[in-house]
Regions:
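Active-site and adjacent substrate-binding regions of carbohydrate-active enzymes
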Residues: 1-378
Length: 378
């Protein structure tokens, strides 16, 4: 990776297909503008979360073809593609096989059986799932209210709880959502290996590891960035990726004050983090560069390699700013963006805490063309 600008786009962001973006990048005016291109994951077959709920990693040929990817490579542009390590869609062939065959499915342990995981660390409820001990719950990091469970109905009528950190929707025995993978299953590691090989075959140079920090789990742990399990897991993924010529880019969505980015840098990884969007809004709206410059200075002095962006499908990250901006300034930033139409998304645990503001970057800047151009220039 280098320090030149990276284009971030969905396959249908400019025109209706990836071929339209390739045609744009071929224009004389665009030559040498971008050294790399992050193609977001609706490139694959997906069903939710703007591409981040992957059904399978085959190309969605309604939007992109291998010829499109080859054209981009011929322009000298490195491709960055996603691999979502923690979960797969409830519409994935593995999960559909589990729903269809139950205990007879070869993917019975591909996903995390909640009761098997918590056996010996909680009490069975009348609803058929184990309620973890309070000592364990106090340690856990939650992404939504309640326990992260999806009750899956097997063919014999039994309802079996499976770990479901993110979205879920249930209609009888039809499921939508993102089901957590059991990284202790050999089949999951076969899946990881095959997927990395497939991504490499598309010509990718960089693989962004989405949600990797949720994958290692253990009773009594936070189950987000577990130490040392997360770093051991990342090393195993590296050992699969390196022979394929793939550079890993772990995604970190955590408070600056936790210094996870420094841990990754110390272990030799670049990071995909979310500090820049809020810092630039703060700099522009408050007419000051202090906090933005302090962060940039740290990156340069400590030789930290990082990939940043401004807008994303989730909105403007805020939790990440803790330790970078004073708390009152973060709250003021939230109020400003909400006054411009944004909506606050909270995390759920023992108490609600802000996570991000759902808004486009243009809206967050008050729909000002000059501010948007300045943000992009920075």
């Amino acid at each position: 990776m280098n320090n030149k600008p990276m284009l971030n786009a969905y396959p249908d962001s400019l025109g209706g297909k990836l071929s339209d973006i390739a045609a744009l990048l071929k224009k004389k005016e665009m030559q040498d503008t971008f050294s790399s291109f992050y193609i977001l994951p609706s490139l694959y077959h997906s069903d939710l979360d703007r591409g981040f709920s992957v059904v399978d990693y085959n190309l969605n040929e309604e939007l992109a073809t291998i010829e499109d990817l080859s054209q981009l490579k011929e322009l000298g542009i490195d491709l960055k593609l996603d691999f979502i390590l923690n979960h797969a869609s409830a519409q994935s062939p593995q999960f559909k096989d589990l729903v269809e065959k139950g205990d007879e499915s070869e993917y019975r342990d591909f996903f995390i059986d909640w009761n098997k995981f918590w056996e010996g660390h909680g009490v069975m409820t009348d609803e058929g799932y184990i309620q973890p001990d309070e000592s364990c719950l106090k340690q856990m990091f939650f992404r939504k209210p309640g326990l992260p469970i999806l009750m899956v109905e097997f063919p014999d009528g039994r309802r079996v709880p499976y770990w479901n950190t993110f979205y879920q929707e249930v209609h009888g025995r039809e499921y939508l959502g993102q089901m957590d993978l059991n990284i202790k299953s050999e089949k999951v590691w076969d899946f990881y290996r095959e997927t990395l090989e497939k991504i490499a075959s598309y010509g990718a140079a960089i693989v962004r590891l989405d949600a990797f920090a949720y994958a290692p789990k253990a009773p009594g742990k936070k189950n987000f960035l577990n130490d040392p399990e997360t770093w051991e897991f990342l090393q195993q993924i590296h050992e699969l990726a390196a022979p394929l010529g793939l550079t890993l880019l772990p995604e970190i969505h955590a408070a600056y004050e936790e210094k996870i980015y420094k841990t990754l840098a110390d272990k030799g990884y670049a990071t995909y983090d979310f500090f820049l969007p809020g810092l630039i809004i703060d700099a522009i709206e408050n007419r000051r560069a202090d906090y933005l410059a302090k962060w940039a200075r740290e990156i340069v002095e400590d030789k930290i390699s990082t990939v940043n962006m401004l807008g994303c499908h989730d909105g403007i990250p805020l939790l990440d700013l803790k330790g970078l901006l004073p708390e009152d300034d973060i709250r003021s930033l939230i109020d400003l963006i909400v006054s411009r139409g944004g909506m606050v998304k909270n995390l759920h645990g023992q108490k609600n805490i802000y996570y991000q503001v759902n808004a486009t970057y243009y809206s967050a800047l008050g729909e000002s063309d000059s501010k948007m151009l300045l943000a992009r220039a920075i």
